[in-house]
Amino acid sequence: KCCMRPICTCPCCIGP
């Protein structure tokens, strides 16, 4: 999953 990567730009990672 994108959120599990060292560099994440997904909404779930950069969200509140």
Swiss-Prot record:
The modification Proline amide is found at P16. The modification 4-hydroxyproline is found at P11. Keywords: Amidation, Disulfide bond, Hydroxylation, Secreted, Toxin. Expressed by the venom duct. GO terms for molecular function: toxin activity. Signal peptide: none annotated. The cysteine framework is III (CC-C-C-CC). Belongs to the conotoxin M superfamily. This is Conotoxin Reg12e. It comes from Conus regius (Crown cone). The lineage of its organism: Eukaryota, Metazoa, Spiralia, Lophotrochozoa, Mollusca.
